[in-house]
Amino acid sequence: MYIMSKKCYDTSEKIDREQECVEVNYQHRNFESILEIFSVLFIPFLCNSGKKFLQISNASFFLPACFYLLGSSSIIQLYEPLLWLSSFPFCILYVGFGENSVLYHEMYTVCLYNALLSLTQRWKWLSIVLDGLGNSSVNLKLHETVILAFLEITQNSFTFIEGILICTGLTGLCFATFSYEVSPVVSVLSGVLLISLPTLILLNLCILKLAAKLHLSALFTTCLIYFFSALLVFLVSRSWVAGQLGQAPEVWLFNQIFSHRNSLTRIKIIIWWIICLGCFIFILLRSNRNNPLGKYFTTEDEVLNFRRKTYHALVVFLFLPVCCLDPHFLHLSFSGVLFIFLFVEGIRILRLKPFGKMIHEFLWEYTDNRDHKGPLIISHIYLLIGCAIPIWLSNALKGPVASVELLVGVLCLGCGDSMASIIGKRFGKHRISKTNKSIEGVFAFSISVFLVLHLTQAFHVCPSVTFWKTLFMSLCTAILEGVSTENDNLILPMYMWVLYQALD
């Protein structure tokens, strides 16, 4: 356990030293951080008036506010990991799913564990307590194992907070998969993240070490990796998913598309995606050839930002019109595409011929400083996960039910984040001191989400939501986007989803 605490500490320290964003002076309290704490700790619970949150057992989740408002200058900085690794997951669990959810007690202990893990960044002796907790609980031991494996695989690609937050979600997926009977689409998702990915990584590492020891040629090593990866996916992952589904995955997938009662709708969705992707590729090729962006943007940073946000716009066209048509199919599609993205990223990292170098050169043109910290290029994966999280969470809570909450990922990232970034960088004059984002960008985020959400209701894309509820969700999420230094693609969709559950 001490090894894990030290690894987490070293990871967070190294990433914080290399971080390029505006540094926050924790010696002095600022209004932006207070607003961030209030947004996460209080707004969802105040909106969720039917819950009795203020209990002694939940007092630990108010530690971020206590540390920031009452603590000395040496411990003020602990508020952020406590807020995002313990209080925020608990907010999702308590407000989003409720005390009667099947995984409540397991995930409750994980939230407490994350709080202690955050405190070990300041007080190393708490690792002894973590060690005792990990050895006394199978659930916490699983969470510890997930964290160790994730940090080892990803190196410095994620910040400490991002890494532990993702591990918390993976641990919840493990609990749901191995402790309870899950739906077929969850079986596919667990097969992707818990079976295929770890085994592929271990296999490829073994092949690379063997090739280096035996001095095998690069071409032969590449062939070995492709062959054994395909064999492993076919034997291990396919067997797992087949056991969960009760039939061959390819047969099940064919039936889901062509023999389901919603087959016509699903075929239309696939055709729509093909049309959108075809048009996007055509526009992308033309723009690369003619380079028209220099006429409208004055710096390379603005051009890069606009090019990155075109993929956010693509997400809007791909998913916004179809999210509520067939939530079950969207859940399945996101799970499949996530596996493809991760598999392609593996090819890029290993530079496997003939596609590895080509993929790397293409993706590298769209990277920023966050993609340069470790071996992974994560921006496009983050975008996909951010759009998928509300659909995954809603499916776990209610099943495949058409609802506005399915759209919040696309709204936050495709509309809000894109407009906030483009407007803020181009026209922003009034800067927020903590994050260097602009107030103009915050307003652009809120207005764009609000207007697009009302347009979707006007065109009957999704069920209706009251005017004040829409305004409140868009404004609160925009404020959090403006004052938080955490990754927008990860936290904003989950936060807006929680607000919807609190107001529902």
From Swiss-Prot:
The EC number of this protein is 2.7.1.108
Top enzyme class, one word, equals transferase
Q: Which GO terms describe its molecular function?
A: dolichol kinase activity
**Highest taxon of the lineage:** Eukaryota
Query: What's an example Gene Ontology biological process for this entry?
Result: dolichyl monophosphate biosynthetic process
Q: How does it sit in the membrane?
A: Multi-pass membrane protein
Membrane spanning stretches: 56-76, 78-98, 158-178, 188-208, 216-236, 264-284, 326-347, 374-394, 404-424, 441-461, 463-483
Provide the membrane-side ranges marked Cytoplasmic in the record.
Answer: 1-55, 99-157, 209-215, 285-325, 395-403, 462
Q: Which InterPro entries match?
A: Polypren_kinase (IPR032974)
Regarding protein family, the annotation reads: Belongs to the polyprenol kinase family.
What is this protein's name?
Dolichol kinase sec59
Q: What is the native source organism of this protein? A: Schizosaccharomyces pombe (strain 972 / ATCC 24843)
Cite the source lineage: Eukaryota, Fungi, Dikarya, Ascomycota, Taphrinomycotina
